């Protein structure tokens, strides 16, 4: 008998090497974490890790899988580099080839491998808990797919499945596999039938089901953590050329932001508002040092008071404090920082601030990643090392960087998901410092569910959360939240009551819903009376905003008019935002837009008109008015357009109107000063919490998690509504767009290998999507429904019929037969 295993796992490596590398990577990942003993003891986690590592690919020891992989070697690795050529030639003889080819043709399931390992591992699990055994079974069984609902169908083998597993077991090279596991003190069962009856029959499921629902989220989180740990290691062996970057996190200089501020702005505040910014910054730093052991922190400040830099500094301070605590406990854990924003449109803006900070203090490339659907991957990690494409993907999508800037969607769909790709990064939530900027953008129906899970992440993984908002952090209720501007809330209120930049005028709103014609008349009157003022008009619907823009453009030929909405190409939106920031001095600036300007777009105008929306959106709109307090008194004028508020949750609109009515009663007039905003926001937060106290959606989601219904959790937790009746349309209107489209077509037509094509498209995607806009179905003729391309192209001759470069889709609609157009 040979003294080493000849089994093969991939076309370029033996199974023994693959398992050894998965062991090495998963050990590094786990050892970098501090996990609370209430979750699992270090000994338990280490043992479960090794069981998963050494049995997840046991099914590759079957003759069926070995034949499949050797067949692939002849196609992909004909020189047989890195593997035993004699073994391959022996295995691939004519008789074996014919017999195995026929068996696989009759039943392709014989070539699968995950399920067999899921059952064989049961002979090495020490615990009697049937629920734990089911979790470990599920993790191995689904490590090449997505987690399934824990159910009778998932855990009870039907006769056909049992027959396949027994046939696979009969054709495993167990003597060879024992060479791999003998040094680890694991064993293989003597026979398979008993295992399948014990852990794949009705009695097993009855015992598992008696453990459901669980008391809390622990089993749900245990499944996600172990699944993520195995995925990170399994994929890491295939995607990483070197292992040095695994588990490595950088401890940022606690004085980094202070040093940046000194170089960027100087030491003396230049404007009155700068004094408030500096006071808030210092108070937050002081208070986070006093409260290092709190799960939830809040930075509640008015818009324009430097929340971003203050939050970055708070995270760096907390990272240093926690790293010191872990070191005192004998560990080497350094928390990652994950900065989450509600919209992709502001990720680059905030990441650029971080890059400036890192650059000013001499931090090289490789410490920061942007992770969202429009982002490219960084080319380096620490120490300026060059990364391959697969390494870039691994580190970025796995949140392996010391600082990741991402979206709420990426964060929350890592927790409320069953998807393999999303869950790979779950383990890096452990010990992380997570900043949620503009946290109020999480839909109210998810508040309680998110609160429960965030608390569980702290309880088991010591994860910390910093909520940044200009409104009260009503996401968390009834739990300890340290307000970093002032734990007593006295100074927090003072930051708001001391503001006098703007006033909220409710007079127009109190007139009731107005037609667009009536509103345009009001807008025009105001503009003519204030020719020295800039105007921002925010409407809720694209169609309405387009109509208002066109009419105001006609009425104000000498003004500088700009239009923004989701109907405008991203490349053009960026250009227009820069124009708005730097307007001509000799023209009145008028900007008409939808709520896209609420997404952290840093613009500043004198008078803002806002269509009725939930109060947090009104707050965001107010943040676009007289931000630095240098223009006298800015005005935010609320109005209500006919059918305009229909895009929002009716409950939120009702609460907003009730809160504003009470504000009018308190003030005795229809103009609310900025100093009253804190009280209004407090009132709104209390109303929101009261309304969602009996949230059925929360109860249902928690019930699914306690019953380990992973598919149901994934299918029902959606931050972004899927617009199934929308088209992705590429507007090919210029030389730059045409070059990008040609590159896209070339990839589709010429790159045959699906992995190479996927990688080439990913690299092109950020540039491609700058010229893509989502069209409502009715904005294009029905003939386009037959276009099978995921992206429809409108070229220079076609797009003018359906798309206007100024205002986007909608003005050239052609109603279908028996249909009217309404966008």
Predicted regions and their residues:
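Conserved Walker A/P-loop ATP-binding site and its immediately adjacent core
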Residues: 333-358, 372-375, 542
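Accessory nucleic-acid engagement/destabilization modules that flank
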Residues: 3-259
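C-terminal helicase lobe and adjacent C-terminal extensions/tails of nucleic-acid helicase motors
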Residues: 126-127, 132, 458, 517-532, ...
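Walker A/P-loop
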Residues: 292-315
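Interdomain hinge/linker at the junction between the two RecA-like core domains of SF2 helicases
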Residues: 470-526
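Post-DEXD/H (motif II) to motif III coupling segment of the RecA-like Helicase ATP-binding lobe
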Residues: 422-433, 440-495
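Conserved helicase motor
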Residues: 369-381, 540-543, 561-577, 592-598
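Inter-Walker segment of RecA-like/P-loop motor cores
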Residues: 360-416
